[in-house]
Design a protein with these regions (language model features):
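Short, small-residue-biased leader/transition segments that mark boundaries at the very start
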Residues: 1-3
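A short acidic, Gly/Pro-enriched loop at the edge of an enzyme's catalytic core
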Residues: 24-42
Length: 147
């Protein structure tokens, strides 16, 4: 356990460096970065919108894979009221500003639900949009649920 882990007062906490898109990437001993069913809770703050749409299904499968049987999620991210068009998705300034990769709000819950997550709800959802671009509303939400 690293010093940082001990300093926060928990003995079951570990900090790992890696890409959320590659939780299943194998190390030199052929072990994934994070083992199956080894995580109690996944907390994420504005990370998933930075994952390309092509990589999202793998990302979600890995989130489910690493959570234990009582695992929970609390994911704060940016969603949109309309699907973000490809020309905006390809705008690097909007991508780094957490806009281009915003999840279409109805898909955000349904994509987790399709993988078997339960008790999904928005613990928080901003009433007012954070940004509006080309008549697309972008807002913050916090999705909670469990396996």
């Amino acid at each position: 356990m690293c010093i940082r882990d001990r300093n926060i007062g928990f003995n079951n906490t570990e900090f790992l460096e890696g890409s959320i898109e590659k939780l299943d990437e194998l190390d030199k001993d052929l072990n994934p970065l994070i083992a199956d069913k080894s995580v109690d809770i996944i907390l994420s703050n504005c990370v998933l919108n930075l994952v390309s749409p092509e990589s999202r299904s793998n990302l979600l499968r890995n989130i489910k894979r690493v959570l234990n049987d009582n695992g929970r999620i609390a994911i704060s991210d940016i969603v949109s009221n309309k699907k973000v068009p490809l020309r905006l998705q390809n705008d690097h300034d909007l991508w780094t500003g957490c806009i281009s990769g915003a999840w279409y709000e109805p898909d955000f819950i349904s994509d987790f639900k399709e993988l078997g997550f339960k008790n999904l709800e928005f613990a928080e959802r901003s009433a007012e949009p954070w940004k509006v671009i080309e008549d697309i509303e972008f807002r913050t939400v916090t999705l909670v649920g469990n396996i």
